[in-house]
């Protein structure tokens, strides 16, 4: 609903425009129970690993080594009780363009955690029910659009799809197929 959403939506823009990445610094200020739990280093580490992996799967160094091999990526979450359920996310993105010209992108995302999460939970319940009625069982990759960590079969070394627009195409295709129609979105 916040930091990962911004990364999964904005990193494809950087990659599509072939902009280089020098660094991405993200921090969240949370005052709810989520912030309190993540204030513990052991709990934060799990979240940090999932947030860091989002960029690596979208801005793939092997595909464009001159643009994405050596960038600095830092993630922080800060508990601040007066914030309550209001979430504030800051992202500073240092990019470079043609001829190595440095530029910056700043994002200040102010939102309410529960208000962002509640409709996603409802959609997950409804779409899970639809999948069960359609006879779909096991990993439901099309639900990744709603999740921080995309659904994938890690036992088969399947690569998760973190790219928000690809996740959306997968979701639309699955809904069309469950409705008896052919998929109409290509995933590239």
Regions found by a protein language model. Give the residues of each.
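Conserved anion/nucleotide-ligand pocket segment
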Residues: 2-70, 74
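C-terminal active-site/capping subdomain that shapes the small-molecule cofactor and substrate pocket
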Residues: 96-188
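C-terminal and late-domain segments of enzyme folds
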Residues: 47, 53-136
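Glutamate identity and glutamate-enriched acidic tracts
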Residues: 40, 48, 56, 62, ...
């Amino acid at each position: 609903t916040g930091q990962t959403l911004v990364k999964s939506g904005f990193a494809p823009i950087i990659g599509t425009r072939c902009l280089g990445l020098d660094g991405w610094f993200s921090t969240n200020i949370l005052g709810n129970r989520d912030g309190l739990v993540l204030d513990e280093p052991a709990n934060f580490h799990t979240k940090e690993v999932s947030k860091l992996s989002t960029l690596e799967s979208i801005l793939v160094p092997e595909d464009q080594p001159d643009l994405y091999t050596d960038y600095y990526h830092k993630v922080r979450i800060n508990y601040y009780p007066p914030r309550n359920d209001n979430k504030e996310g800051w992202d500073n993105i240092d990019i470079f363009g043609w001829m190595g010209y440095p530029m910056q992108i700043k994002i200040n995302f102010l939102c309410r955690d529960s208000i962002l999460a509640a409709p996603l939970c409802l959609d997950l319940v409804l779409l899970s029910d639809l999948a069960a009625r359609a006879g779909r069982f096991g990993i439901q990759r099309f639900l990744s659009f709603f999740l921080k960590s995309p659904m994938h079969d890690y036992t088969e070394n399947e690569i998760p799809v973190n790219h928000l627009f690809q996740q959306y195409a997968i979701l639309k295709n699955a809904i069309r197929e469950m409705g008896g129609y052919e998929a109409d979105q290509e995933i590239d």
